[in-house]
Amino acid sequence: MKIEGSVALVTGANRGIGKAIATALLDRGAAKVYAAVRDVATVPTDDPRLVPVQLDVTDPAQVRSVADTLGDVEIVVNNAGIGRPATPLTATIDNARAELEVNYLPLLATTQAFAPTLAANGGGAFVNVLSVASWVGMPALATYSASKSAAWSFTNSARVELKHQGTQVVGVHVGFVDTDLTAGLDTDKIPPATVADSVLDALEAGASEAVVDELSRTVKAGLHDDQQLVYPGIEAQFEAARSTPAH
């Protein structure tokens, strides 16, 4: 996917990873980036190529309306996400539902709404910001991990379905990033700009995944091992995150 001259839409583009991706797209020559956020007043206005768009990703009708309006979009970055740290015994149905409604279901809504637009514009790409927690379920992140696992599974299905129309689908796996979600976490974190660079490199390379950091690479490398071998080491790395999700 060529970024220079392209038009992208990034959800949650007013902070953290989303803001970094929007900035990186512009730095690499994107013609326009729609910053899709709940409150457009939170989007900087110093670059005319960055266009605020009001969007609640949990409202499928609003997603469809935005897709119908923005017929020039070629890249859709599904970045918006929330986390409600809890164990299987302390999690609430309401919080688990909220995580699914932000972390998973918007991927379904945006894929259905924007796939025709991307096809009409030459194929384009979807980028779904997932998590290392997509691959491993940890007790303190039980429902968050489940929502990200659902998003990962859907991403894989969408990749197969959309291949016929020439649409690239990139899944982004990353551990601890220096954002609001990890503000209270005392552990090594990577800057959002590092995630953004990895995402855009994957896009331009035609890749299906961006495995951003060492934690994610370690987890992926161990996925084929017996769970009795994988989980002790992974759980130790996640111990510091018992109060804060990775992304």
Task: Identify the function of each model-found stretch.
Residues N79-P85:
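Conserved NAD(P)H cofactor-binding loop of Rossmann-fold oxidoreductase domains
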Residues D188-K189, A193-H247:
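C-terminal tail/cap regions
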Residues L89, M138-A142, L185:
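Active-site loop immediately N-terminal to the catalytic Tyr-X3-Lys motif
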Residues S131:
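Residue(s) in the substrate-gating loop at a strand-loop-helix junction
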Residues V7, N14-R15:
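Conserved glycine-rich cofactor-binding loop
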